[in-house]
From Swiss-Prot:
Known role: One of the early assembly proteins it binds 23S rRNA. One of the proteins that surrounds the polypeptide exit tunnel on the outside of the ribosome. Forms the main docking site for trigger factor binding to the ribosome.
PROSITE patterns membership: RIBOSOMAL_L23
Keyword RNA-binding: yes
Pfam families cross-referenced by the UniProt entry: Ribosomal_L23
Assigned protein family: Belongs to the universal ribosomal protein uL23 family.
Gene Ontology terms for molecular function: rRNA binding; structural constituent of ribosome
Protein name: Large ribosomal subunit protein uL23
Domain of life: Bacteria
Length: 98
């Protein structure tokens, strides 16, 4: 199956923090994904875009913060993150080019 536009719309960006760098030692990679993406869609997109085997996908929805600007209450958007576990011996180097 070839990579489609939906695969590119599913995976938005990698999440690069100290915690995700430590997770990379356990064959796990963290991505910011579309809010309507399912675990199966995320696994298919990662397998197709990065040519790796995915064994497990865990998702987290972080609720947007409430912010005030000049007395007007607003809210930031919710963010969905996916922790993707890769098969043994496989890796994705997302820190290249930083």
């Amino acid at each position: 199956m070839a990579a489609t536009a939906r695969h590119y719309d599913t995976i938005l960006s990698p999440v690069i923090t100290e915690k995700t760098t430590l997770l990379s030692e356990q064959n796990k990679v963290v991505f910011k994904v579309a809010n309507d993406a399912t675990k199966d869609e995320i696994a298919a997109a990662v397998e197709e875009l990065f040519k790796v085997k995915v064994t497990k996908v865990n998702t987290i929805v972080t609720k947007g913060k409430t912010k005030r600007f000049r007395g007007i209450v607003g809210r930031r958007n919710d963010v969905k993150k996916a922790i993707v576990t890769l098969a043994e011996g496989q890796s994705i180097d997302i820190t290249t080019g930083l």
